Each structure stands twice: as structure tokens, then as C-alpha cells.
């Protein structure tokens, strides 16, 4: 992994709760959008936008288990403007709704 990839990833990790564009990510490594895409694909086998989506979903999963915040609030905290889209993407990634995920993992912790 090169320094430019690390710079882009650090930016995503720091600002994932905000509205981030491919241009914002590319600017962090002082590269064009197409170069940012190529670097991500080469070293991370992913696109910056998809990496951001996965990171947001992973952070939301952590918040579901470690806080009692409502799903809508968590969705907003991790950068989703639309809770329905958040729930759809969460279910696609984790194969269950955010509420089901919370119930499963909180119950698991009580066993």
C-alpha cells in the first residue's frame, strides 16, 4: 500500500460521518479522481466510494451494539442522509436489519 492510499483511507476514517465525495478523497492524496480510483483498485481491490460505504456500515454495527441510540440517529452519525437507504445497505451487507443485528449481538453478549 502506498502513502497516497493511506492518506485517502485516513481521510475516510476521520470524516466518514460527513458528506464525502470522490473528489474530496482524491484531494487528500493530491491526485485526480481517476488516479484515486486506480490506486484504490490496485491496492485495496475496492473503490473509494465502496470502501467508505463498508466503513460506515461497520461503524454503524459497532454503534448498534455499544449504544442505545435509535437506528435513525446512528444512520445520521455515520453519514447516511436517508435512513431507508441505510437500512437497505445494512441488510445487504449483514443479511439482517439493523434492529435484528442489535438484538442478535446484545443477546449473544448475555449468554
For the regions a language model picked out, list residue spans one by one.
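Conserved small/polar residues in nucleotide/adenosyl-binding loops
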Residues: 1-3
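Low-complexity basic/metal-binding stretches
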Residues: 5-6, 25
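Terminal helix-turn-helix DNA-binding modules in bacterial transcription factors
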Residues: 10, 14, 19-23, 42-84, ...
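Helix-turn-helix
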Residues: 26-33, 37
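Short hydrophobic/aromatic patch on the recognition helix
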Residues: 36, 40, 85-86, 90
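C-terminal interaction modules of eukaryotic adaptor/scaffold proteins
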Residues: 91, 102
